[in-house]
A protein has these predicted regions:
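Conserved N-terminal entry element of GNAT/NAT acetyltransferase domains
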Residues: 1-12, 147
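Acetyl-CoA-dependent GNAT
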Residues: 8-85, 96-98, 102
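Short hydrophobic/aromatic beta-strand or adjacent loop that forms the aromatic wall/cage
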Residues: 53, 139-145
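Active-site acidic-Proline motif in GNAT/NAT acetyltransferases
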Residues: 83-89, 113-114
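Conserved active-site alpha-helix within GNAT-family acetyltransferase domains
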Residues: 93-94, 114-131, 137-141
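Conserved GNAT acetyl-CoA-binding A-motif
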Residues: 102-114
Length: 149
């Protein structure tokens, strides 16, 4: 396996990216039925994220293993997804570094309060908890986390 490389999202990446989103979130929250949200997610991907966000793909040996979405106008990092078999391999940190390059004035994101693994990951990369809220889809409580240079 070679090191991950980054590239810009292409429309041909949609099916693989959506499938990776499903697989990754299902692994992180097996008690939730993300398959039931797939149509909603695909519509959100096409109509809410792609028109405003820069999407960067991480791949190795030609296989997509992660992606990050960043809206540089609002600093909002909506999604960072890494294939579970690549968790703790540096892919997420590489994607966050690219997100910081895209939005050098700062980044904001929301993370489920019970996602201790992700909160620790973001903290290690310089993010601080700056607020609390509620995920509008799941109703789960979230931390707003922010990074500023």
């Amino acid at each position: 396996m070679s090191a991950a490389t980054l590239r810009r999202y292409q429309p041909r990446d949609e099916d693989v990216s959506v499938a990776l989103w499903l697989r990754t979130w299902q692994k992180a929250y097996p008690e939730l039925d993300f398959a039931a949200r797939l149509d909603w997610w695909r519509e959100r991907w096409r109509n809410e994220l792609l028109p405003v966000a820069e999407v960067v793909i991480a791949e190795t040996d030609g296989t997509i293993i992660g992606f990050v979405t960043v809206d540089p106008r609002t600093f909002y990092l909506d999604q960072i997804v890494v294939a579970p078999e690549f968790w703790r391999c540096g892919v997420g940190a590489t994607l966050i570094a690219e997100a910081k390059r895209i939005s050098p004035s700062g980044l904001d994101l929301d993370v489920n309060i019970d996602n201790v693994r992700a909160i620790g990951f973001y903290r290690r990369l310089g993010f601080l908890i700056t607020g609390v809220g509620k995920n509008p889809t799941s109703g789960k409580p979230v931390h707003r986390m922010s990074w500023r240079p």
